[in-house]
From Swiss-Prot:
Bilayer-spanning residue ranges: none
Record's keyword terms, sorted: Activator, Chromatin regulator, DNA damage, DNA repair, Nucleus, Transcription, Transcription regulation
Span of domain Myb-like: 955-1009
The organism's taxonomic lineage, starting at the top: Eukaryota, Fungi, Dikarya, Ascomycota, Pezizomycotina
Segments forming domain HSA: 685-759
Region (Disordered): 108-531, 550-611, 871-906, 1088-1127, 1220-1244, 1292-1324, 1462-1542
Domain of life per record: Eukaryota
Record's compositionally biased regions (Gly residues): 1303-1312
Protein name: Chromatin modification-related protein EAF1
Subcellular location: Nucleus
Any single Gene Ontology cellular-component annotation: nucleus
Function: Component of the NuA4 histone acetyltransferase complex which is involved in transcriptional activation of selected genes principally by acetylation of nucleosomal histone H4 and H2A. The NuA4 complex is also involved in DNA repair.
One Pfam short name: Myb_DNA-bind_6
Length: 1542
C-alpha cells in the first residue's frame, strides 16, 4: 500500500507499455492469421503472417482489421469473420492420395538445390509449438539478409562450453535426403515414428533465455501421415550411447560441421506415440508429413546432429518447399508402396509448376532407387524387426489401441551402400567446412536451424530423420558448437546396425552427466499436436494440441520437451487428463485441422499473473441479477421462500445464506447504480491533501502503550529464558550423582552470622569500618564492586533492551563498564523510537500521528481483478489447540484493511502436547498406562439384560463393515467405546439395523472371531452367552406358540401375527436405509393426525353453532351503579345494627337476670347447707357469662369494630378479671373451637354475632389490610344464629335451674340443675365427638338430632342451617360460600414465629417463605404441646381427662390456651378461697356420664374429689407462676396493639 518510487515506477510503466504494444501486435497478427485461415484453403502467404505490420493485400482484410482494432476499443466481432470457402471433394481426394502414395526419395540431388533444402529443427518446433497456427517457413527468406553476427557469436560461445546443460534437449537436423535409399515398411499406425524431428539442427540458444519461460505462440497446425517411414530405434549392445547422453557420444566425434545428411534406416519399426505435436506441416505446401517426428519420449530419442547456423540465412521460400518435398518423400506408406506407374500418372495430372508435381517426381526417383537396393537389405530387415519389437515403448503411447502392432513389411534397400554413401558425403562436407575455418555462410550447402530464428511469428515444420543419419554421423566430424546445441534436444537410441557398421575416424568419447528428467512433455503442456493424417482417415484416434503464447525473448529454454532417459528404465511422465480424453474421443476423418485458440492469457508481462481466468459465470453481479429475476418470475423463488418451505433440516449456515445473499445484493445494487451514473470508477482519485493534525496527548499515550507492550513482551521472553535455564539446572541437579553435584556447586563460602554487638562507643567503631566509597555518578550504575554482587546474587537479571541479538533461550551476560561497551550499547538497535514530548506547534508539527493509516489511495480499485465476496466467520466455535497466534510477535495488524488474510501462512504446531497420547511416539506411555492389547469386553458399560436381547431388533452388518470392525479391533486394541464411536452412523436417528453400541460391536466381533477358549469358561462370559441363548430360545418359543395358535384357529378370522426373527446380528449384502422412509412415514402420520384433529374441532364447532338458538339472547346480569351499591350497603348495615341492638337488649336482660339469680342463690346458700358449694360454682359461672355478655353488648353498641377479638377469650377474660373490655386483639377462631370449651365455660360463652356488628361496614378495610400482608385474615363470616340461640337456651336453662334450686331443697335442686344442664353437656360431647376428642356415638346422635331441630327452626329466616362446628364448615347466609377466616396471631407469638422463620432460612437458604413459616409453626406448636402436657401433669389429670386438661385438649389455637390458662388461675383462686371453688370441677366429670346417671353421681363425685382438689390446688399454684409470666408478656404485646373499646 506504500507509494512506488520513481525508478520503480518508470520501469513498471515501461514494462506496461511494452506489454501493451506486444498485445496490440499479437492481436493484429492473430487477426490477420484468422482472416487468412478463413479465406484460403491451401497455401498461406508467409510474409503476411511473419510481419503483422505488413500492408494488407485486399480491401476486405483492411476492413476486417479496422472492424476489430483494439486501439479503437473494439472487440472481436464474429459476424465480421468471412465465411471459409468449402473444401471440394476432389481437392480432398487429391490431398489424401498424394499423402498416402508418396515414396521415399533415394538419390536426391547433391547440388546446391538439394543442399538448400531446409530441414526444420525439432527444437524450434518445441520452442514455438504454441505460435500462430498459420505461420510458415517463408520467414526464413525474409531473415536471410539478417546479419550473422549474433549467430557467430553464439556459436563461438557454445564452443567454449563443450558440456551442455543437462536440462536442455532439442533435436538435430536431418542429413540430406540423398543418403536415403530404402523404402520403409509399415509400422504401428497409432505410434508415430521418430523422424527428422530427432535429428534437426540445434543452436546454442540456451544461454540467451530464461529456462523458466514457456514458449506460447500459436503454431502451424499440421497434418501427418501414418508413421512407419523411419527405422525402429533399438538398443545397441556394443554402443554406449544412452538416450540421455547419446547426443554427446555421437556429436563430439569431430569438430567439423556436417553438411551431408545420412539416409534413413528403412528397416525400423514405428516408435511409440509420444509427442505428436512435433510433426509440424510446412506452410508452403499442402503436403502432409508422415515422417515428422512425434517421438519425444525418452526411450526413442536418438543422437542429435547439428549443422552450422549460417545455413539458415541463405534459405528462401523455394528451399523450404524443397525441404517439405523431401519430407514427403519419406512418407512411404504404411498402407502400401506406390508403384512408379502410379506416380508417373499423377505427375502428368498435376500442374507442372506445382509443389505436388515436384514431390511426385522426387518420389519416382526414390522408388527406383529403393527397388535396386531391396535385395541387399532383406537380411537386415528381419533382424531389426525383432529388435524393434523388443524396444521399450514410451509412456505416451495410447494403450487403448492394442490391436495395432509393429509389423515389418517388404525388405528395404541394402544399408551398407547407403551408409558408405552417406559417410562419403559427410566427410566431404566436413573437409570443406574445416577449410573455411569458422562456420561461415555457405550458399546452398548448409541450413540454419529454426531454433535460431528470432522472428516471433516463426513457424517450423518437423523434418524426417532417416535412420541412417545416426550411423553416418557417428563417424562424421561434428563441431563442439553443435555438441552444445545437440545436447539440448531429445535424442533417439542408436540402432544396432548403425553401431556395428559405423567406424568413426576420430572417436572422441565424452562422458556427459545424465540429464535430469522433466515432468512436462510437449503433449502435456500443449506444445505439440498429436494429430496425423492416418488418424484423420480413421486409423488411429487423433490428438488435439493445446496452443500457447511465446514471449518476445524466445530460446531453446522455452521448450517443454523432456530429456531422454535410458530405454531400459523408462520414467513416467505426467500428462494432462484432457490429452487422454482428446486422444480417445477424436477419431473422425478430417483434412487440415487448425488448432483452437487457447483460453490461457498471454504471458508477456514481466510478472506472471497468479489470478485465475474470470469466467462469465463468475461475474460478481450474478447474485443481483438472480435476485431480480427471482422477484419478477413466477417459477423461480427466492432463497427465503425456498428455505421457508424446505422439507429437510435447515442448518444455521443455510439460514444465514439468505441473510448473506441479501447483504451482498444490497451492496451490489448500490455499486450497480453508482456505475450507471458514472460515479463508480475503476480508477480512484488520490486522497485530498489535508493539513497535518497536531499530535495530542492521546497519541503520546498510544505510543507509550505500544512501547510498553514491546517492553513487556521482551521481558516475558527474558523471564521465560531464565525460568527455562533454572528448570534445566534443577533437573540436572536432581539427576546428578553426589559426585557430579559437587562439580555443579558454586565455590562459595557461607558468611558467618553476625552477632549483635553490644553498645560500643562510636569512636572505636570508626577505626574498624571501611572507608566510604566515592560517590558514582547516576549514569554509572554498574561499578566493578557492584558487578560482582550482581553476578553472585542476580546472575541473569538485566534490562530486556540488551538482548536483541541473542536467542530466546539465552540470558544476558554481565558486561563490564568500558568505553567499548558503552559504544556497543549505543550502537545497538532499539525496538522503537524513544518517546518524545510533542511540541504543540500548529505551524509545523514534527510528525504526523495519522501517517500509519492515512495513505495515498491505490490507482486501481480492488474490484478490477478481485471479486466481491462477503466472508463470514460462521458460528462461534471452541478454540482449538492449533488455533493460536504467537503472542510474542510484533505483527499487530495495525493496518488490517491492507491484508484481509488473517489466517497464518504456515500451519502452527500444537500449543500443548499434553493430549498427544495417541501419537506414535507416545505408545510406550499408553501401554504403560493402559494395557490395550489385552482382550476385554466393554466392561465400562453394564451388560445388557436378557429382556433387551429378547426385544431388540437385530443389527445388520455388511461385509465391508465386518472388515472395518476387524481392522478397528486390531488398531484400537479392544477399545470398544472408540470403535463404537467410529462405526456409529453420523445421525441422530439410528434404526435397529444401524445400531453400533459397544456391546453390539463386541457381540458381532465374537460372532466373527469367537471367544478365546480361556475366556469362554469364565462366569462372566457364561452369563453373557447364557442371556443371548435364552433370549433366542424365548423368541423361538414365541414363534412356535404363534404358529400353534394359527393352526388351532385356522377356521377363525384371526390375522396371523408376524414371525419374529432372531435378535442376534447377521450379515446382509446391502443394508436398506429406511431412515428417511421412516421419518417421512412419521411425518405423514403426524400431519394426518393434525388434520383429523382440526376436522373434529371444526365439526364440533359447527354443531354447537347449529344447536344454539338463533334468537336466544344472552342473559345479562343487571348492572348497578355505585350509588345503588352504597344504598344496599347502608340498608344492610342498618338491619344489622337493629339486630345487634335487639340482641344487646336481650343480653342485658339476661345479665340482670343472672345477677338477680346470683343474689338469690347466695341467700339460699346461707339458708341451706351443702348445696351451697354447688350453687356458688354455678352462680360464679353465670356471673362470668353475664359479664361477657355485657362486654359484648358494649362492644357491639359502641361500634368500635373490635372484630378480631375472640368471643371465647373475651368471655374467659371477663370471667377472670371482671372487666368489661378484653385486651386480646385476636380474631375469633372457627366455630369448631366451641366444641372444646368445657362445661364450666359454656354458660359464659356468647355467640360471635355480638362481635360482628360492623363487619360488613368494614369489609373494604379488611380487604385492604389483607392485600398489605398476605397473612392477614379474611373478614369473619356473617353471625352464626345457631350459636346465638344456643347460648340463649343455655342461659335460660341456667336461669330456670337457678330458680328451681332456689325454690326447692338442696338435693332435689342439685338434681334439677344437673338435669337442666344435661342438654348442653350432650351438645358439648357431640361437638367434641366430631372433633375426635371424647367421642361417643350416643352423644353424636343426640347432638345431630338437636342440630336438625335448630336447622328447621332457623331456616325460615333464609339463614344457613347450623352445621356441626367440628366439621369446620363456615356458616353464613343461605347459598353463600365464605372461606373460613384465618386466625390472627398475637404480636408476641407472631414475633416468635418470625424469629424461628429467620433461623430456618439462615440454616437453609433454599427454603421458600411458605416452607419456613410451616416449619416455624410446627416447632412452636410442639413447644406449646409440651407446655400443655406439663400443665396437665402439674394439674394431676392423667391422659388429659377432666379439669383443665380436658378443656386444653379441645382447644385449637394458642389464644384459647391463654384464655383457658387465665380461667385456670381464677379457678385456683376460688379453690383456695373455699368450697365454692372446689365444686367448680363438677361439670368436667359430668360431661363423661350419661344423662340418666348424672344427677345421682354428682354428689358422690363431689365427696370423692374434695381431698383430690386440695392436692390439685397445690399443684396448680406451682404452675400458676409459670403461666403468669407468659400471660403478662401476651398482655403487654396485645395491649399495645389493641385499640380501646370506649
Amino acid at each position: 500500500m506504500t507509494e512506488v518510487g520513481a525508478a520503480d515506477l518508470s520501469r513498471l510503466l515501461q514494462s506496461k507499455r511494452n506489454e501493451c504494444s506486444s498485445i496490440v501486435t499479437s492481436r493484429k497478427r492473430k487477426l490477420r492469421e484468422l482472416f487468412v485461415v478463413a479465406t484460403q484453403s491451401e497455401g498461406l502467404p508467409h510474409p503476411v503472417l511473419t510481419n503483422p505490420d505488413a500492408p494488407t493485400t485486399t480491401p476486405a482484410e483492411w476492413q476486417f482489421l479496422q472492424a476489430n482494432d483494439i486501439n479503437q476499443s473494439k472487440t472481436l466481432n464474429e459476424a465480421s469473420i468471412p465465411t471459409r470457402p468449402t473444401f471440394s471433394l476432389e481437392v480432398l481426394k487429391k490431398s489424401l492420395a498424394k499423402s498416402i502414395f508418396i515414396a521415399n526419395e533415394s538419390v536426391p540431388k547433391q547440388t546446391s538445390e538439394n543442399s538448400n533444402k531446409s530441414h526444420v529443427t525439432d527444437a524450434q518446433d518445441e520452442q514455438q509449438s504454441n505460435r500462430a497456427s498459420l505461420s510458415t517457413k517463408s520467414d526464413a527468406a525474409a531473415t536471410s539478409t539478417r546479419p550473422n553476427t549474433p549467430e557467430t557469436s553464439t556459436e563461438s560461445a557454445t564452443t567454449a562450453n563443450p558440456v551442455p546443460p543437462p536440462a536442455k534437449n532439442t533435436q538435430a537436423v536431418l542429413p540430406p535426403a540423398d543418403a536415403i535409399e530404402k523404402p520403409i515398411p509399415t509400422t504401428s499406425p497409432d505410434v508415430p515414428a521418430s523422424t527428422g524431428a530427432n535429428a534437426n539442427s540445434i543452436t546454442n540458444e540456451e544461454d540467451r533465455s530464461d529456462p523458466n519461460e514457456v514458449a506460447s505462440v500459436p503454431r502451424q497446425p499440421q497434418v501427418t501421415f501414418e508413421t512407419g517411414t523411419k527405422g525402429e530405434h533399438v538398443e545397441t549392445g556394443t554402443s554406449s550411447v544412452k538416450s540421455g547422453h547419446g547426443v554427446g557420444d555421437s556429436a563430439v566425434t569431430t569438430g567439423v560441421p556436417s553438411t551431408v545428411k545420412p539416409s534413413a534406416d528403412v528397416t525400423r519399426s514405428a516408435d511409440a506415440l509420444s509427442s505428436p505435436g512435433s510433426t509440424a506441416q510446412s506452410a508452403t505446401t499442402p503436403a502432409v508429413h508422415d515422417d515428422a517426428s512425434t517421438d519425444t519420449s525418452p526411450e526413442h530419442e536418438g543422437p542429435q546432429y547439428v549443422e552450422p547456423a549460417e545455413q539458415k540465412k541463405i534459405e528462401d521460400g523455394t528451399h523450404e518447399r524443397d525441404t517439405d518435398k523431401y519430407h514427403q518423400s519419406h512418407q512411404d506408406g504404411d498402407i502400401r508402396a506406390p508403384s512408379t506407374k502410379d506416380l508417373e500418372d499423377r505427375v502428368l495430372e498435376a500442374p507442372p509448376d506445382s509443389a505436388e508435381a515436384q514431390l511426385l517426381q522426387e518420389s519416382i526417383r526414390s522408388n527406383v532407387a529403393a527397388e535396386n537396393e531391396a535385395a541387399l537389405n532383406s537380411e537386415s530387415t528381419s533382424q531389426e524387426a525383432d529388435t524393434a519389437i523388443s524396444a521399450p515403448v514410451s509412456e505416451d503411447v495410447n494403450m487403448s489401441d492394442v490391436d495395432d502392432r509393429v509389423v515389418k513389411a517388404a525388405p528395404t534397400v541394402g544399408e551398407k551402400v547407403e551408409e558408405k554413401r552417406a559417410q562419403q558425403i559427410l566427410d566431404t562436407d566436413a573437409k570443406s567446412a574445416l577449410a573455411t575455418g569458422a562456420p561461415a555462410e555457405i550458399s546452398g550447402s548448409k541450413e540454419i536451424p529454426d531454433s535460431q530464428e528470432e522472428a516471433p511469428e516463426q513457424m517450423d515444420v518437423d523434418a524426417p530423420e532417416p535412420k541412417a543419419s545416426t550411423e553416418s554421423q557417428i563417424g562424421a566430424p561434428i563441431s563442439l558448437e553443435k555438441l552444445d546445441a545437440a545436447d539440448t534436444g531429445p535424442s533417439s537410441p542408436t540402432p544396432a546396425h548403425i553401431a556395428e557398421v559405423a567406424t568413426p575416424p576420430e572417436p572422441v568419447r565424452q562422458n556427459s552427466p545424465p540429464k535430469a528428467e522433466r515432468a512436462v512433455t510437449r503433449v502435456s503442456s500443449g506444445a505439440m499436436r498429436p494429430k496425423s493424417v492416418s488418424e484423420i482417415v480413421g486409423v488411429t484416434p487423433r490428438q488435439t494440441p493445446t496452443l500457447e503464447h511465446i514471449s518476445t525473448n524466445k530460446s531453446t529454454n522455452h521448450q517443454l520437451t523432456p530429456l531422454t532417459s535410458t530405454p531400459k528404465s523408462p520414467t513416467l511422465r505426467h500428462r494432462h487428463i484432457s490429452a487422454h480424453q482428446r486422444q480417445a474421443s477424436r477419431s473422425q476423418p478430417s483434412t487440415v485441422v487448425f488448432g483452437k485458440q487457447s483460453k490461457k492469457g498471454e504471458e508477456k508481462s514481466m510478472v506472471t499473473s497468479q489470478h485465475d481466468t474470470i469466467l462469465p459465470t463468475e461475474d460478481y453481479y450474478t447474485p443481483l441479477f438472480v435476485q431480480g429475476f427471482a422477484g419478477s418470475s413466477s417459477w423461480m423463488q427466492p432463497i427465503e421462500k425456498i428455505l421457508y418451505t424446505a422439507n429437510k433440516t435447515v442448518t444455521t449456515p443455510d439460514a444465514n445464506l439468505a441473510i448473506q445473499d441479501h447483504q451482498a445484493c444490497k451492496v451490489l445494487r448500490r455499486v450497480y447504480h453508482l456505475q450507471q451514473h458514472d460515479k463508480w470508477s475503476l480508477r480512484q482519485p488520490k486522497r485530498c491533501p489535508e493539513p497535518t493534525r497536531p499530535p495530542s496527548h492521546w497519541d503520546v499515550v498510544l505510543q507509550e502503550m505500544k512501547w510498553m507492550r514491546t517492553d513487556f513482551r521482551e521481558e516475558r521472553k527474558w523471564k521465560r529464558a531464565v525460568a527455562k535455564n533454572l528448570a534445566y539446572a534443577c533437573a540436572e541437579w536432581h539427576e546428578a550423582t553426589p559426585e557430579e553435584r559437587k562439580t555443579l556447586q558454586v565455590q562459595a563460602v557461607v558468611p558467618p552470622k553476625m552477632k549483635p554487638a553490644s553498645d560500643v562507643a562510636m569512636v572505636d567503631a570508626e577505626g574498624t569500618n571501611h572507608l566510604t566509597p566515592d560517590l558514582v555518578s547516576s549514569e554509572d550504575v554498574e561499578s566493578i564492586d557492584n558487578l560482582d554482587d550482581l553476578i553472585e546474587d542476580f546472575p541473569e537479571t538485566i534490562a530486556p533492551s540488551a538482548i536483541f541479538n541473542l536467542q530466546d533461550e539465552d540470558v544476558v551476560f554481565g558486561l563490564r563498564r568500558t568505553a567499548a561497551a558503552d559504544q556497543l550499547l549505543e550502537e545497538l538497535p532499539m525496538f522503537g523510537a524513544p518517546l518524545q514530548v510533542p511540541k504543540f506547534d500548529l505551524t509545523g508539527p514534527e510528525w504526523d500521528p495519522d501517517a500509519h493509516w492515512r495513505r495515498p489511495a491505490l490507482p486501481l480499485s480492488k474490484y478490477v481483478e478481485g471479486h466481491m465476496k462477503l466472508v463470514s466467520d460462521g458460528p462461534p466455535r471452541k478454540r482449538s489447540r492449533y488455533n493460536y497466534q504467537n503472542e510474542d510477535s510484533d505483527d499487530e495488524g495495525e493496518a488490517g484493511f491492507v491484508s484481509s488474510d488473517s489466517t497464518p501462512s504456515l500451519p502452527l504446531p500444537s500449543a500443548t502436547d499434553e493430549v498427544a497420547l495417541f501419537n506414535p511416539e507416545m505408545k510406550h506411555i499408553r501401554d504403560r498406562l493402559y494395557v490395550g492389547h489385552q482382550f476385554r469386553p466393554p466392561s465400562e458399560y453394564p451388560m445388557p439384560s436378557q429382556s433387551f436381547f429378547e426385544c431388540r431388533s437385530p443389527s445388520q452388518w455388511t461385509i465391508a463393515e465386518d472388515d472395518e470392525l476387524r481392522s478397528l479391533v486390531r488398531e484400537h486394541s479392544y477399545n470398544w467405546s472408540l470403535i463404537s464411536s467410529i462405526l456409529a452412523p453420523r445421525s441422530i436417528f439410528n434404526s435397529g439395523a444401524e445400531r453400533r453400541t459397544p456391546w453390539e460391536c463386541f457381540e458381532r466381533w465374537i460372532n466373527l472371531e469367537g471367544l478365546p477358549a480361556d475366556m469362554s469358561k469364565t462366569q462372566y462370559f457364561k452369563a453373557y452367552m447364557g442371556r443371548i441363548n435364552t433370549a433366542q430360545n424365548m423368541i423361538n418359543i414365541q414363534n412356535q406358540a404363534m404358529a400353534q395358535q394359527q393352526v388351532n384357529q385356522a377356521n377363525g378370522a384371526v390375522t396371523p401375527g408376524r414371525r419374529r426373527h432372531q435378535s442376534i446380528p447377521f450379515r446382509v449384502e446391502r443394508r436398506r436405509n429406511q431412515k428417511h422412509l421412516t421419518m417421512l412415514d412419521a411425518m405423514r402420520k403426524l400431519a394426518k393426525k393434525r388434520e383429523t384433529t382440526a376436522q373434529k374441532q371444526q365439526h364440533t364447532a359447527s354443531q354447537n353453532a347449529a344447536n344454539k338458538k338463533t334468537n336466544e339472547s344472552a342473559s345479562q346480569r343487571p348492572t348497578k351503579t355505585p350509588g345503588e351499591y352504597s344504598r344496599l350497603r347502608y340498608e344492610r348495615d342498618q338491619a344489622l345494627a337493629e339486630k345487634m341492638a335487639q340482641f344487646a337488649s336481650r343480653q342485658e336482660a339476661q345479665r340482670r337476670a343472672v345477677l338477680q339469680a346470683r343474689a338469690q342463690g347466695q341467700a339460699a346458700q346461707m339458708a341451706a347447707g351443702t348445696p351451697a358449694a354447688v350453687q356458688a360454682g354455678q352462680n360464679s359461672a353465670q356471673a362470668a357469662a353475664a359479664a361477657a355478655a355485657a362486654a359484648a353488648a358494649a362492644n357491639g353498641m359502641n361500634g368500635v369494630g373490635r372484630v378480631n377479638v375472640p368471643n371465647q377469650l373475651a368471655a374467659a377474660a371477663a370471667a377472670a378479671t371482671g372487666q368489661a373490655r378484653p385486651r386480646m386483639p385476636m380474631q375469633s377462631p372457627a366455630p369448631a373451637s366451641m366444641g372444646g370449651v368445657p362445661a364450666h365455660m359454656a354458660s359464659g360463652l356468647v355467640p360471635p354475632n355480638q362481635m360482628n356488628s360492623v363487619q360488613q361496614a368494614q369489609m373494604q378495610a379488611m380487604q385492604a389490610m389483607q392485600g398489605q400482608h398476605n397473612r392477614m385474615p379474611m373478614p369473619n363470616p356473617p353471625p352464626d344464629v345457631s350459636l346465638m340461640m344456643r347460648a340463649q337456651r343455655i342461659s335460660e336453662q341456667q336461669r330456670a335451674a337457678q330458680m328451681h334450686a332456689q325454690g326447692g331443697p338442696g338435693t332435689p335442686g342439685q338434681g334439677a340443675v344437673g338435669a337442666q344442664q344435661s342438654p348442653p353437656a350432650q351438645m358439648r360431647n357431640a361437638m367434641n365427638g366430631v372433633n375426635g376428642i371424647n367421642s361417643n356415638p350416643m352423644n353424636q346422635q343426640s347432638f345431630l338430632n338437636n342440630a336438625q331441630a335448630m336447622m328447621a327452626q332457623f331456616n325460615q329466616g333464609n339463614l344457613s342451617s347450623p352445621q356441626a362446628n367440628g366439621l369446620h364448615m363456615p356458616s353464613g347466609p343461605a347459598g353463600s360460600i365464605a372461606p373460613r377466616p384465618q386466625t390472627q396471631l398475637p404480636a408476641a407469638i407472631q414475633a416468635q414465629l418470625n424469629q424461628l422463620e429467620a433461623q430456618y432460612r439462615a440454616k437453609n437458604s433454599s427454603l421458600t417463605s411458605e416452607q419456613a413459616r410451616q416449619m416455624a409453626t410446627e416447632h412452636l406448636t410442639r413447644l406449646m404441646m409440651a407446655q400443655r402436657s406439663a400443665m396437665n401433669a402439674a394439674a394431676g389429670t392423667a391422659g388429659g381427662q377432666g379439669g383443665l386438661a380436658g378443656s386444653i385438649a379441645a382447644t385449637t389455637s394458642p389464644h384459647q390456651y391463654a384464655a383457658l390458662l387465665r380461667q385456670q388461675q381464677q379457678q385456683q383462686a376460688s379453690a383456695a378461697a373455699g368450697s365454692p371453688g372446689q365444686q367448680h370441677q363438677q361439670p368436667h366429670q359430668a360431661q363423661h356420664q350419661p344423662q340418666q346417671q348424672q344427677s345421682q353421681q354428682q354428689q358422690a363425685q363431689a365427696k370423692q374429689q374434695q381431698p383430690q382438689q386440695q392436692v390439685q390446688a397445690h399443684a396448680h399454684a406451682q404452675a400458676q407462676h409459670q403461666a403468669q409470666q407468659q400471660q403478662q408478656q401476651q398482655r403487654q404485646a396485645s395491649g399495645s396493639a389493641t385499640p380501646s373499646a370506649g
